[in-house]
Amino acid sequence: MRLNIVVVGVGGQGALTTSGIIARAAMRAGLNVVTAETHGMAQRGGSVEVHVRIGDVRAPLIPEGGADVMIALEPAEALRYAKFLNKNTLVILNTRKIIPPSVTAGTAKYPELDEIIGELRKVTPRVIPVNASEIAEKAGSVLATNVVVVGMLFGYYSMPFGIEHVEEAIRETMKSKIVDLNLKALKMGYNQAISGRPSAV
């Protein structure tokens, strides 16, 4: 068994937290996990790319075209890292944009959401656009957007470990005052996925 997940977003969205939760959950289930952050991160707003490889793997980097799943916390970042997609990749795409300074300054143009989705669907039909940030706000904080998307992953994809392992990972890694909020966000994301909306067409 081998599962390749690439998590992309911008600094401050919790891409590293997302990958860390998934990795810890997989390890709790007794699975081999290798992770790699392959793009400069530190500053808020910079592009972030994290690879999570689970199962029969040694090398930390997912090869181009080798992702089984892409979690895109920001729409344009999904396009930036589309080289990892193939015709079977599941893409969970948070639709809330974070406009980069270059666009604000007028030196670059941010693509329309429909354009982004259309380009991704040229590679894989399995693109699921969802405003995960809105769901997170309903759970209590937009900062839980990444956890909403993890919940959706378990609703849409047959994962090799249970969502209860994710709950354990959240309890272990997050500050006690935000655990309940994040568990709620996880459940809301999962329920959103299993309800069949939005469709994965």
Curated annotation (Swiss-Prot):
| Enzyme Commission code | 1.2.7.8
What is this enzyme's catalytic activity, as reactions? indole-3-pyruvate + 2 oxidized [2Fe-2S]-[ferredoxin] + CoA = (indol-3-yl)acetyl-CoA + 2 reduced [2Fe-2S]-[ferredoxin] + CO2 + H(+)
Q: Give the keywords, sorted.
A: Oxidoreductase
- What InterPro entries does this protein's entry cite? Indolepyruvate_Fd_OxRdtase_bsu (IPR017719), IorB_Oxidoreductase (IPR052198), Pyrv/ketoisovalerate_OxRed_cat (IPR019752), Pyrv_flavodox_OxRed_cen (IPR002869)
One Pfam family name from the record? POR
Q: What is an example of a GO molecular function annotated in this UniProt entry?
A: indolepyruvate ferredoxin oxidoreductase activity
**Family matches, as PANTHER family:** INDOLEPYRUVATE OXIDOREDUCTASE SUBUNIT IORB
* Family matches, as NCBIfam families: IOR_beta, PRK06853.1-3
What does the annotation say about its assembly with partners?
Heterodimer of the IorA and IorB subunits.
What this chain does, per the record? Catalyzes the ferredoxin-dependent oxidative decarboxylation of arylpyruvates.
Q: What is this protein called?
A: Indolepyruvate oxidoreductase subunit IorB
Q: What organism does the record attribute this protein to?
A: Archaeoglobus fulgidus (strain ATCC 49558 / DSM 4304 / JCM 9628 / NBRC 100126 / VC-16)
Please state the gene responsible for encoding this protein: iorB
